[in-house]
């Protein structure tokens, strides 16, 4: 597969140079396995993160349609909403965010610090709801209201996770394969699996470019039974848009997200502290901490296909640390 497959889709150059792919020597020594990390936490805008890859395609489509407003939804501490708001600010667009409080907390840090603080800095119009029970319908209803006020809205789904946004992680797979070429033969790739776009895009790209590497999604919000159909549906939609076959098995581990989305757990927080203390790299309590906990336990329990090098895809999320600091 070549980049030619993606050139049919408008894309904004928001990231620029490839994000680093680094060897983690101290973590590798600690775990007894070669560990590499793809640093998508270092993307430009709003303290970094994976959603910018999706927004390169989604925001380009919004501009193509003549939109003047980006509308999206997520949790109060959503990394996706924060990055969408930053892109809107950069492009001179209005941004409306529909937020929920998925953990039902009244803690002031969660309600006003971290990602939520940054939304105010980006001049985001925030609308609260009791719960995102049907986010697609709720976003459509919000878009109708915003349009009635004279705006031209463009709706971005939760997590930027549709077939168009997930192309950002087909691009990422191309980047990873080029960085690994003649450098390291990655055996396994680990990524947090939430709204499914990042996981699905990587699945399509890596199947074409690094078929020897198993891709493992560590769920952050759902059981395998609930998450698998979401990832598979997006995997197929992305492949269809690129006129490719998607035959790779989707592997999910759901042992590490309890007690639920947005609520830290002991193993996840231990992983956050371990990476900070061994490598000076910041994970987060919601996504990457739990995904790293899965990687660590996967080595201990011998869940990987072999003992070859592992690549951890760091999707960002460090601003949430400031919202969860009592847990640290």
From Swiss-Prot:
Keyword Lyase listed: yes
The EC code for this enzyme is 4.4.1.15
- Please report a single Pfam family linked to this protein: PALP
Extract the InterPro entries matched here. Answer: ACCD_DCysDesulf (IPR027278), D-Cys_desShydrase (IPR005966), D_Cys_desulphydr_bac (IPR023702), TrpB-like_PALP (IPR001926), TrpB-like_PALP_sf (IPR036052)
GO BP annotations of the record are:
D-amino acid metabolic process
Its top-level enzyme class, in one word, is lyase
Coiled coil: present as a keyword of the record?
no
A GO molecular function term, named singly, is: D-cysteine desulfhydrase activity
Task: Tell me the cofactors it needs.
Answer: pyridoxal 5'-phosphate
Annotated family: Belongs to the ACC deaminase/D-cysteine desulfhydrase family.
Question: What name does the UniProt record give this protein?
Answer: D-cysteine desulfhydrase
Q: Which domain of life is it from?
A: Bacteria
The protein's matches in PANTHER family, at most eight in alphabetical order, are given as: 1-AMINOCYCLOPROPANE-1-CARBOXYLATE DEAMINASE-RELATED
The UniProt catalytic activity note for this protein reads: D-cysteine + H2O = hydrogen sulfide + pyruvate + NH4(+) + H(+)
UniProt-listed NCBIfam families? ACC_deam_rel, PRK03910.1-1, PRK03910.1-3, PRK03910.1-5
Going by the UniProt record, its keywords in alphabetical order are: Lyase, Pyridoxal phosphate
Role noted for this protein = Catalyzes the alpha,beta-elimination reaction of D-cysteine and of several D-cysteine derivatives. It could be a defense mechanism against D-cysteine.
Q: How does it assemble?
A: Homodimer.
Q: From which lineage does this chain's organism come?
A: Bacteria, Pseudomonadati, Pseudomonadota, Gammaproteobacteria, Enterobacterales
Q: Which residues carry the post-translational modification N6-(pyridoxal phosphate)lysine, per the record?
A: 51
């Amino acid at each position: 597969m070549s980049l030619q497959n993606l050139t049919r889709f408008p894309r904004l150059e928001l990231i620029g140079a490839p994000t680093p792919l680094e060897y983690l020597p101290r973590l590798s020594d600690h775990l007894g396995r070669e560990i590499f990390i793809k640093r998508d936490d270092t993307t430009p805008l709003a303290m970094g993160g994976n959603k910018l890859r999706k927004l390169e395609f989604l925001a380009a489509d919004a501009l193509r349609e003549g939109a003047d407003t980006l509308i999206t939804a997520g949790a109060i501490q959503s990394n996706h909403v924060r990055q969408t708001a930053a892109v809107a600010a950069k492009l001179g667009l209005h941004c409306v965010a529909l937020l929920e409080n998925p953990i039902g907390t009244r803690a002031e840090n969660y309600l006003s610090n971290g990602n939520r603080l940054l939304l105010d800095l980006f001049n985001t119009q925030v609308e609260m709801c009791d719960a995102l029970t049907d986010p697609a319908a709720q976003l459509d209803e919000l878009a109708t209201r915003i349009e009635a006020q004279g705006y031209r809205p463009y709706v971005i789904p939760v997590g930027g996770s549709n077939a168009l946004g997930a192309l950002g992680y087909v691009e990422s797979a191309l980047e990873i394969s080029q960085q690994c070429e003649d450098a390291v033969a990655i055996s396994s790739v680990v990524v947090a699996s939430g709204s499914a776009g990042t996981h699905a895009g990587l699945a399509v790209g890596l199947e074409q470019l690094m078929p020897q590497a198993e891709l493992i999604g560590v769920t952050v919000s759902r059981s395998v039974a609930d998450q698998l159909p979401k990832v598979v549906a997006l995997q197929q939609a992305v492949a269809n848009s690129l006129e490719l076959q998607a035959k790779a098995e989707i592997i999910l581990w759901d042992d590490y997200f309890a007690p639920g989305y947005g609520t830290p757990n002991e193993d996840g927080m231990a992983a956050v502290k371990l990476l900070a203390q061994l490598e000076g790299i910041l994970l987060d309590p919601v996504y990457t901490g739990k995904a790293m906990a899965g990687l660590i336990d996967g080595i201990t329990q011998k869940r990987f296909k072999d003992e070859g090098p592992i690549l951890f895809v760091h999707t960002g999320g460090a601003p949430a640390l400031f919202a969860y600091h009592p847990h640290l």
